Amino acid sequence: MGAELGIYKSCVSARSTDKEILKHAQDGGIVTSLFGFALDEGIIDGAIVAATKEFAHKHPAKAMMDNSNMEFHEPWRPIPCIVNTKAELLAAAGTKYNISPNVSLIKEATRSFGLDKVGIVGTPCQMQAVRKLQLYPVGARDVGSSIALAVGIFCMENFPYQSILQLVEDHAAMKMESVKKMEIGKGKFWVYGKRGQIVQLPLKVTHKYEQPGCHVCLDYVANLGDISTGSVGSPDGWSTVFVRSKIGDSVWAKAMAAGCFETQPIEKVKPGLELVTKLANEKISKNKKTLEERATFGVGKALRNPYI
C-alpha cells in the first residue's frame, strides 16, 4: 500500500483470546490485551488511558482531576487515568468519542506516580505529541525515555464533549447517563442504551460537531505509534493491527507467543486494507483542502505597520 498507511512491519486482523476482555472491549480488545500483557511481563509498570467518571470515582488516586467536584463531572467525559492492573484496564476499556488529554499526564505519571516504564494510548495527533516530547523534551526532561509503549488508534476526527452531548441527547434522544456504548461504523454513529435501545445517526449529521483542529490532520492510522489499531478493515469483533516499530514488533511477538491474540491475514478478511486505505486517503484529501485554504489567510506573513 502507499504512504497513507505509514511505515509498518506487519498488518493483521486480530482479537483478544481473553473472553473477559472481549466483553468489555470496543472491538477486538487489542489495547486492553496489549497493556495487560505488558503489565504482566514488566514491559510497562503503568499505562495512561482514557477512563470515565465511574472509574475516577472508584480509583480517585489514579485520575487527573479535582475529585472534590466529582459529583458534577459529566457522564462519558473522558478523564486521563493511570492503570496498573488488569482489573483497572477492564474498568477503563472502551472508546470515548471525545477529547481526552492523555499526553498531559505523562510527566505526572513519571513523577507523582513514580512510573519508570509508561504505556500510553492515543489518537494520531497524540502519537505525534509523544514523539515530539521524546525528541524535544522542553520542560519534560527525562520523561520521553520513560515511554515504553505507545499504542495509536485510528481516527478520522474527534469531538468536543459538548458536541457528543448534543449528538446523544438532541439527535439520538438519549440521556448521557443511560448510554452503554458509542461507536462509529458502517457510515453511522451508533449509540447503545443500557436498556437495550440502539440509535443510529448518519455521519453527515456529525460533521458540523467535529473538533476544528481535526481538519488539519493528515494521519488516519496513527503512523507514529509503536502499534496502531482500529476496527476498520476487519470483521465485526476484530481489529486491524499495524505493527510499526522495533518496540512494537518485540511486544507483539511476545504477546502472540503467549497466546494473547488470535489473528487472520489481513489479505483474507473483508473489507481489508482496501477500506483502510480509502478512508486514509479521504482524510488526507479532505484536510489538505483545509490546509490550502488556511495558507491564504496570511498567517506567518509579516504584519503591516498599522501607523503607516
What annotation goes with each model-predicted range?
Residues M1-I308:
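Iron-sulfur-associated redox domains of electron-transfer enzymes in respiratory
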